[in-house]
Amino acid sequence: MLPAISKSVLSLDVGKRRIGIAGCDPLGITITQLEAIKRTTFNNEATQLRQLCDLRDVRGIIIGLPLSDLGKETKQSSYCYTYGINIAKELNLPLAWVNEHSSTWEAGQRFKLQNDRSGKLDSAAAALLLEQWLTEGPELEFLKN
């Protein structure tokens, strides 16, 4: 019998002020909302994410892309796409993107966090992204240099 492929991944909801974070166990059963990272410099964010990846034995990164109502690229989705590429290269991890259209609104409704400014809403949105990825994919991919 082949060993199960670890689904220990982090999901990132990349915003202008914070990066919401959620993780799951290696079997992809339990999703945990983690403390959001306050945006500073890329190097500082990468250091914090690397420590978290080491602590949780992370095998991949999921990045939310805030596409438009019609599924088209937006200014923020373009920024998140570039950030995803840069952080995946920095952490040497495969990644996948999921459409996060309305994820923050949905997280606010589902978890009663509509007026949150602490970062809990960002991490709740990241948890929804991870839930979506676990059920729909796509597969993680290493970037080609």
UniProtKB/Swiss-Prot annotation:
Enzyme Commission number, as recorded: 3.1.-.-
NCBIfam families, per the entry: RNAse_H_YqgF
Database matches in HAMAP family: Nuclease_YqgF (MF_00651)
GO MF assignments: nuclease activity
Gene3D superfamilies recorded: YqgF/RNase H-like domain
Protein's name in the database: Putative pre-16S rRNA nuclease
GO biological process: rRNA 5'-end processing
Native organism: Prochlorococcus marinus (strain MIT 9211)
EC class of the enzyme, as a word: hydrolase
Subcellular location: Cytoplasm
Family note: Belongs to the YqgF nuclease family.
SUPFAM superfamilies for the chain: Ribonuclease H-like
Cellular component GO terms held in the UniProt record: cytosol
Signal peptide start-end: none
UniProt keywords, alphabetically: Cytoplasm, Hydrolase, Nuclease, Ribosome biogenesis
One Pfam family cited in the UniProt record for this chain: RuvX
Function noted in UniProt: Could be a nuclease involved in processing of the 5'-end of pre-16S rRNA.
